[in-house]
Amino acid sequence: MTTPTTPTTPTAPTTTITDRMPLPRISLLGSTALLFEAPGAMDLPQQRRIWALARLAQNWPQVQEAVPGMNNLMLTFSSPPPPDLAPLRAALHEAWDEGHTMSLDGRTFELPVAYGGAAGPHLADVVAHTGLSVDDIVAIHTAPLYTVYALGSHPGYCYLGGMDARIATPRRKVPVVHLPGGSVSIGGIQTGVSASDGPSGWNTIGRTAMQFFDPQSQPPALLAPGDRIRFTVLRVDV
């Protein structure tokens, strides 16, 4: 005779520290600024959370300016924040955990780009890294409608989201000391457009004639987070 056995009750899976989403990182920048770095993917849903957090934090009494970056937010203060940052950290964590997002109804710009040649001196390096042809890279680069995630690096420079990972190329080991304004470049999984002359460690594949920053205009930067860019082909030089 077989003795019946008592069914075992399934146990709930145990959540360990490694199963949890990493916490945002909060650090001081000098004596009057703080940087909030969000974990997770660098994509539009994530960036919309950054925009929402910036809008909220901008209204906090101690915050002078809230500046969204790529997966991060910088808060500046008119005077050094109190030594005990626990309340501010808690407010940031709580606001982030609420998961609010913000959609920005920006404008759409078409940027004619001269690819390759003197305008895109590193296009050959992108070809060598990806194994794609020049025509393939240009076609892939011009296909998306890119969203301006943030402004930074230098006045008017726009960080764009939405580049196809097939043309991702590591940043250059030796930066270029002088890169003309309007240069269209690839750095890792990102692409962007230089607003003015200056150094860069990205791979320049082309150039546009559009002016992105004019200190005499109001606002001086042409683009803003939430705007969209579509690159078009002016010509391809090889």
Indicate where each model-derived feature is located:
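Glycine-rich active-site loops that engage anionic ligands at enzyme catalytic sites
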Residues: 2-4, 15-238
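Low-complexity, simple-sequence tandem-repeat tracts enriched in small residues
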Residues: 7-13
